[in-house]
Amino acid sequence: MKILTHNMMACTKKQCMGKGFPLKVESTEQIVLEQEFNYEFTKNIYPKLDWLGIAEISIKFNIPIQLDTTKHSLEDEEFLKTLHNLLCNLKVITGSLTCPNCQRVYPIDKGIPNMLLREDEIYQEIKE
C-alpha cells in the first residue's frame, strides 16, 4: 500500500463516517520503490492531501518533510520531490491500519489493505 493510497482511506464502519480518518499505520515490512519524480502529478495531488496524516506518516517513517502548506511550496522542487518520495515510493508490504475512532484494525498483507468488515460487524451495523 502506497502512502498516497493511505491518505485517501477511512474506516468503513458506519459509526465512523467523518471520524475514521486518518488511519494510523503500523508497518512490519515496507519497501522504497524507485519511481521517477513526476512534478505535475505531485503538484496536482498537493491540494487533496490531508496534512495531519502526512505529518504522522513522515515522522513514523523518518522522512523529514517541511509541513509548510503555503502556496510557495508548489514552487519548491526539493519539497515536491520529498513529498513524491513519501507518497509514491514508500510502500507498506505488511502491517495494519487502525481507525482513530473505533480502534478497528485493518490488516495489510502483500501491500493490500483489507478494508472489508467481518460478517458479525456487518450484522451489528444493520441492527443499529
UniProtKB/Swiss-Prot annotation:
Keywords: Cytoplasm, Nucleus. Gene3D superfamilies: 2.20.25.10. Residues 2-111 form the TRM112 domain. GO terms for cellular component: cytoplasm; nucleoplasm; nucleus; perinuclear region of cytoplasm; tRNA (m2G10) methyltransferase complex. It comes from the Eukaryota. GO terms for molecular function: protein heterodimerization activity; tRNA methyltransferase activator activity. Pfam families: Trm112p (PF03966). GO terms for biological process: maturation of LSU-rRNA; maturation of SSU-rRNA; positive regulation of rRNA processing. Belongs to the TRM112 family. Acts as an activator of both RNA and protein methyltransferases. This is Multifunctional methyltransferase subunit TRM112-like protein. It comes from Dictyostelium discoideum. The lineage of its organism: Eukaryota, Amoebozoa, Evosea, Eumycetozoa, Dictyostelia.
